[in-house]
A protein has these predicted regions:
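Zinc-dependent deaminase catalytic domain
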Residues: 1-117
Length: 117
């Protein structure tokens, strides 16, 4: 979001044209990989990754924008948001990734928790 305009949207899911984990099974569950570890062992992309891709595909610049997401970004998404120039991240649920917090803070990305009703 920039200047009260939605620039792009993203969601957690498999790449375009590929079957979702619900259809083929979750490799992370099958291998007992805990949440927050071994991000490369997943068919899906995080919503933050998809929003950056969608913005790029449609020519929208995210520099200075605010990204709203369900949980605090993981470190992979945090690095991508930093490089995309995102100025602020607003999330509802926490995610235990201290390195992501540190990197966003060091990069000057504002972090806000969306208030619960």
């Amino acid at each position: 979001v920039l200047n009260k305009q939605i620039l792009a949207t993203g969601y957690n899911g498999a790449p375009v044209g590929m079957r979702h984990c619900g259809e083929v099974g979750c490799i992370r569950q099958q291998q007992g990989v805990p949440s927050g570890e071994r991000h490369e062992l997943c068919r899906g992309l995080h919503a933050e990754q998809n929003v950056i891709i969608q913005a790029a595909l449609h020519g929208a610049k995210l520099a200075g924008a605010t990204v709203y997401c369900t949980h605090h970004p993981c470190v992979v998404c945090a690095k991508m948001l930093i490089n995309a120039g995102v100025a602020r991240v607003v999330f509802r649920g926490d995610y235990p990734d201290e390195l992501a917090r540190q990197m966003l803070s060091e990069a000057g990305v504002e972090i806000s928790v969306f208030p619960k009703k």
